Amino acid sequence: LLVEIDCSNRLVYPSFCDSHTHLVYAAPREKEFVDRIKGLSYEEIARRGGGILNSAKLLHETSEEELYESAMERVWEIVKMGTGAVEIKSGYGLNTEDELKMLRVIQRIKRTSPICVRANFLGAHAIPLGYKNNPSEYVDIIINEMIPQVAAEELADFIDVFCDQGFFSVEDTERILMAGLKYG
């Protein structure tokens, strides 16, 4: 059913497509945004106790339902501002259980929100403290455990890696993305 709307003397804009979001999280990181503006690197912020590892700790302590409710509030905020499509990354889980929890929340948002949602698996967002001395062991977990489970449950449309100094190397990134490619 098509409806004609007279837009004479008006402006019509297409909706915004936000291709990089982290809408599922337990606590905001605005202070870190100020630190980034002041020139601190992500690595320096992490050394101060902030960053992705702190977000992962808080997310681990938060229920799936709480994550969904707070994320939906943010979804409605961006809808009101004109967003019509959004990519939502995981990446604050940093273990299989919590990454899957995030992706399930994103899938629920996909089913219940009025906008187009794409899920992005970002298990390679930071190296958990327990793997700092052996990051390749964590990369192996991403490749051999996380990616197969994400694929089996069809929880993600895309896969992503945070390739940066102090995080994942070019070689790690290639290994992870090639593993993801095997699952489509």
Stretches with model-predicted labels:
Residues 41, 49, 82, 181-184:
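Glycine-centered loop/turn motif at secondary-structure junctions
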Residues 2-69:
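Metal-associated gating/positioning segment near the N- to mid-region
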Residues 55-70, 76, 84-184:
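Metal-coordinating catalytic core of metallo-dependent amide/deamination hydrolases
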